Amino acid sequence: MKHAVASLAMLFAVALMAGCATQEGPATTRPDESLVNTYWKLTALDGESPDVVDGQREPHFVLHADPARVMGSTGCNRMMGNYRLEASTLRFMALSSTRMACPHGASIERRFLAALNATTAWRIEGERLWLLDAQHETLARFEAVHLQ
């Protein structure tokens, strides 16, 4: 009888502890951002974080759907052009920019435009975008920014 009471007490204690445990739901991941109509802020170029220069805009772009236009900033100048998107391929075409003289940021601007011109593919995971070259090597990485 003592054995039965001890077993019953132990079973009650285990049930009580199980009831107090927190349950975790399934892991939630953020859905992938849309490539089009999203503000993409440059976070890495040639594997390095770009320097943001005081008084200049951050390098970024937005792909607009109709017509298929790209607009953004190189960090120094405004840029614009066209793009063609087919499944996982992306090509920027006829890119142009304003020609303001900026004492800082010319190197980033040149490399940013070169990366856009070399882009052939893209990949999005959550709020991050990678622009890839023909060998699927990363040219630039971006982060989605939600404007209020």
Predicted features along the sequence, with ranges:
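Lipid interaction determinants
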Residues: 2-9, 18-148
